[in-house]
From Swiss-Prot:
Residue ranges of domain NR LBD in the record: 239-466
DNA-binding region extent: 99-173
Organism expressing this protein natively: Canis lupus familiaris
This protein's record includes keyword Methyltransferase: no
Function description: Ligand-activated transcription factor. Key regulator of lipid metabolism. Activated by the endogenous ligand 1-palmitoyl-2-oleoyl-sn-glycerol-3-phosphocholine (16:0/18:1-GPC). Activated by oleylethanolamide, a naturally occurring lipid that regulates satiety. Receptor for peroxisome proliferators such as hypolipidemic drugs and fatty acids. Regulates the peroxisomal beta-oxidation pathway of fatty acids. Functions as a transcription activator for the ACOX1 and P450 genes. Transactivation activity requires heterodimerization with RXRA and is antagonized by NR2C2.
SUPFAM superfamilies from the UniProt entry: Glucocorticoid receptor-like (DNA-binding domain) (SSF57716), Nuclear receptor ligand-binding domain (SSF48508)
Post-translational modification, as annotated: Ubiquitinated by E3 ubiquitin-protein ligase HUWE1; leading to proteasomal degradation.
Pfam families for this protein: Hormone_recep, zf-C4
Protein name from the UniProt record: Peroxisome proliferator-activated receptor alpha
UniProt region (Required for heterodimerization with RXRA), positions on chain: 304-433
Primary gene name: PPARA
Residue ranges of the region described as Disordered: 1-20, 65-92
PANTHER family in UniProt: NUCLEAR HORMONE RECEPTOR, PEROXISOME PROLIFERATOR-ACTIVATED RECEPTOR ALPHA
Amino acid sequence: MVDTESPICPLSPLEADDLESPLSEEFLQEMGNIQEISQSIGEDSSGSFSFTEYQYLGSGPGSDGSVITDTLSPAPSPSSVTHPAAPGGAEEPSSVALNIECRICGDRASGYHYGVHACEGCKGFFRRTIRLKLAYDKCDRSCKIQKKNRNKCQYCRFHKCLSVGMSHNAIRFGRMPRSEKAKLKAEILTCEQDPEDAETADLKSLAKRIYEAYLKNFNMNKVKARVILAGKASNNPPFVIHDMETLCMAEKTLVAKLVANGIQNKEAEVRIFHCCQCTSVETVTELTEFAKSIPGFANLDLNDQVTLLKYGVYEAIFAMLSSVMNKDGMLVAYGNGFITREFLKSLRKPFCDIMEPKFDFAMKFNALELDDSDISLFVAAIICCGDRPGLLNVGHIEKMQEGIVHVLKLHLQTNHPDNIFLFPKLLQKMADLRQLVTEHAQLVQVIKKTESDAALHPLLQEIYRDMY
């Protein structure tokens, strides 16, 4: 029989057990002639076999000790032997070394032997065992085979050879196919890749997933809003609401459905407050669907999901509201209308106090120049906040938030490399939003007590209950 090998590096010196063994001569000899193993030959990358393409190394012409070698790159050949050019161009320089470990003992592999990458020592050990049909004393200790102790337990060493896939039937002639060589190099590069690179890839994947969920679940985003506010939209510009007359016109067209069922007969402030609630309810629904797309959220206890949304939705709403605001006003009715800041300030108390704090926050928030990918992670971090009152699985939720905040930090470093203070500024905005929501909830309670016509939507009433 003949062993076929594909050297990866220069052959290592013979082991002590090979030199001292009466089988050392066999270590250098072939295990039969070529014809005896013709049935075991695997096809090379070209799918055909030609003896003239391979190099024979032995003690001389006619020697029984010829060794057929499968190289990763062209090996020096005797002048009497010629080799046709490999299909597809010349082989790579011999200096290219694939630093692969022996699958049996972990030493440096010298080539592809008997179906696996193995060192010279383990290759020779397996060859002798197979050829001479050696039987070793059984060992039940499952010895760990390493370079330093591989000669101690022959039974376990042979068992390891078999377990990793060494087989006499895996003998192969010729050079390693280019496709297999390329695959090996790719595997090596993957194994040698910095663990931090793999972690970064996972974090980028998480950021992408959250961003895509954000774009999918929200009707309005910053990109759309900025196009409209800049007057670059392809359709008609938004209808501007700047006084009572234009408000009435908008109510007959843009928000006709919202002011039906008797609402149209109430005063302007109550009608505006009602429309604001309708928009908030719709956004809460969108936020709920978005939250389900955050990895791990849907697996939380249902009570924890409700608690996170109860305390997080308004912070998220006011963060996203900044996208549709500028210093002069804000988009309404899906971007089809624009209500001026001055008109909202002209409403009677306490309604005139509802939106002005949101404009103040929005101007500072917009100054950070975040895009939708940044905002999506920011909103996800707001929702998955582990310090909300009444949570059951605090530790798990805190871990979720830590992961999202870490992704947010890395994303900001990539997306805004010149703004090193953006991340801490954004964390401060989380605290600012809590204060903003607290003040808003208090104002809503005042309206609830003093304005009999300004009824609260049941869903929002449940959110406000026991909030602060």
